[in-house]
């Protein structure tokens, strides 16, 4: 009897949206994460679920009963946890050593809050750098969810055939990536990367997701038509899409991963309207999208798909395809046909990147010169795990060598180092302050007459405010 084709649904959760007031985080936990987990529990569905460590931490603080439900589903095997950086930072835009630390911190958070350490990894915004497979492997991951659209656009043949090029400013390609599917639909040499696990040269297993499937499902969840089409995406269209992919799986592989998108679209509108229509509408209630997500799962199973998870498809697919072609993916690209530099070039990134970099370098040098202290470890963790505003506050309160220099003033009201949200320094969906290497100083530690480090004073001077 032939095996059923497998299908992976992986909502990915990130509570640190820049336009989400921290006071509303519990609301998101209750109106998005809770109904998703209850749907899985009550329907006996199997899915993967990715969340940043900070998202899990907020769940524990703001909605512990929602976290308890997640923990129960993870431990019972209904949900496979998928790990990522502790905060939703684009790894392609920061130094590898910082990325490695935050990846391990994210894994620690999953283990702390659910009792399970993920084997599969997620790369925020699918921002690409060639060192990422080594980074994830060193952090302890066995597999990584990859962006197929970036991979396919690295083939000149596909770029020429589709006429697509990377958008260096935003997500304008998101609704046009179906052109990739139109080109590869009868080409098994390309399809096989979407329907089989593959392995990076270092042995890291990879599974690929694509907007050609995720985008129609997203529009279906939202039930939206605003200016893009006359009617919402229908259940029949979703069914036809899954039927087409079922025949492609039969010809080329064993599974597909059609939904690896924001979990917050289940139960809320999240960023849908600002991304698609540039409308200032954020996190509106969308309770009908919960029922539509259930319909996606039910449609898949009615067509003969088996709901599965990343680790299961890898375990059951046989030897992975050896895939050294990932080395031709251009550094700096991201999902939706965009680029990581679109995030790195935002106003807040350019403003705060040098501040973050100088603070990091100063603390790292102090660690080296003092032989390491717990307070310094805590300061580094604060900087790489929360945001520049909180990092400044934490470091300023440290005893000993990290006391605030007497001739450095405190930030005054109105300065744009905000403490309203812990996503201000490191933007969640799109990092506002990222270490892109724009600041360099051979010795970031400057000492005055008091022999106290002038790291923070120098940081403020660089912004023209000291």
Show where each model-derived region lies.
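Active-site and substrate-binding clefts of carbohydrate-active enzymes
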Residues: 2-31, 166, 180-181, 194-212, ...
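Short, well-structured secondary-structure segments
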Residues: 4-95, 102, 119-123, 142-147, ...
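The substrate-binding groove and active-site-proximal loops of carbohydrate-active enzymes
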Residues: 17-28, 52-60, 85-99, 117-124, ...
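A short acidic (Asp/Glu
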Residues: 19-21, 58-63, 93-95, 128-137, ...
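Generic structural signal for well-ordered alpha-helices
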Residues: 33, 37, 67-71, 100-110, ...
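Acidic, His- and aromatic-enriched active-site or binding-groove loops in soluble protein domains
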Residues: 66-83, 104, 137-192, 287
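CE4/NodB-like, metal-dependent polysaccharide N-deacetylase domain
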Residues: 98-125, 136, 245-251, 255-259
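Short, surface-exposed basic-aromatic patches at helix termini and helix-loop junctions that form
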Residues: 130-145, 295-303
């Amino acid at each position: 009897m032939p095996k059923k084709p497998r299908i992976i649904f992986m909502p990915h959760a990130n509570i640190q949206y820049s336009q989400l007031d921290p006071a509303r985080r519990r609301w998101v936990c209750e109106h998005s994460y809770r109904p998703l987990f209850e749907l899985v529990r009550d329907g006996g569905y199997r899915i993967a679920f990715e969340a940043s460590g900070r998202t899990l931490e907020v769940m524990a603080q703001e909605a512990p009963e929602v976290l308890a439900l997640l923990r129960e589903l993870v431990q019972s095997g209904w949900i496979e946890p998928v790990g990522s950086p502790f905060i939703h930072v684009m790894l392609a835009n920061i130094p590898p050593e910082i990325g490695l630390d935050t990846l391990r911190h994210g894994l620690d958070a999953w283990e702390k809050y659910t009792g399970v350490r993920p084997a599969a990894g997620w790369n925020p915004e699918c921002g690409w750098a060639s060192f990422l497979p080594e980074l994830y492997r060193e952090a302890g991951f066995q597999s990584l969810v990859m962006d197929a659209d970036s991979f396919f656009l690295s083939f000149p043949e596909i770029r020429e055939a589709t006429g697509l090029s990377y958008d260096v400013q935003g997500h304008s390609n998101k609704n046009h990536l179906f052109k990739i599917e139109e080109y590869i639909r009868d080409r098994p040499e390309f399809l096989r990367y979407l329907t089989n696990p593959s392995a990076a040269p270092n042995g890291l297993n990879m599974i690929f997701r694509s907007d050609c499937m995720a985008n129609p499902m997203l529009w279906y969840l939202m039930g939206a038509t605003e200016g893009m089409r006359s009617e919402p995406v229908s259940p029949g269209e979703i069914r036809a899409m899954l039927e087409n992919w079922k025949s492609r799986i039969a010809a080329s592989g064993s599974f597909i991963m059609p939904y690896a998108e924001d979990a917050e679209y289940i139960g809320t509108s999240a960023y849908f309207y600002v991304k698609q229509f540039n409308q200032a509408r954020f996190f509106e209630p969308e309770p009908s999208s919960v029922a539509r997500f259930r319909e996606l799962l039910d449609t898949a199973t009615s067509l003969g798909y088996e709901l599965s998870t990343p680790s299961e498809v890898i375990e059951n697919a046989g030897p992975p395809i050896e895939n050294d072609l990932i080395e031709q993916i251009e550094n700096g690209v991201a999902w939706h046909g965009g680029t990581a530099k679109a995030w790195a070039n935002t106003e807040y990134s350019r403003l705060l990147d040098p501040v973050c970099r100088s603070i990091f370098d100063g603390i790292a040098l102090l660690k080296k010169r003092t032989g390491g202290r717990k307070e310094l470890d805590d300061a580094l963790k604060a900087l790489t795990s929360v945001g520049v505003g909180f990092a400044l506050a934490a470091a300023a309160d440290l005893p000993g060598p990290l006391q605030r220099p007497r001739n450095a003033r405190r930030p005054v009201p109105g300065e744009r180092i905000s403490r309203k949200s812990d996503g201000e320094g490191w933007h969640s969906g799109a990092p506002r302050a990222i270490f892109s290497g724009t600041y360099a100083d051979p010795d970031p530690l400057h000492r005055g007459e008091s022999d106290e480090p002038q790291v923070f004073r120098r940081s403020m001077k660089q912004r023209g405010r000291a």
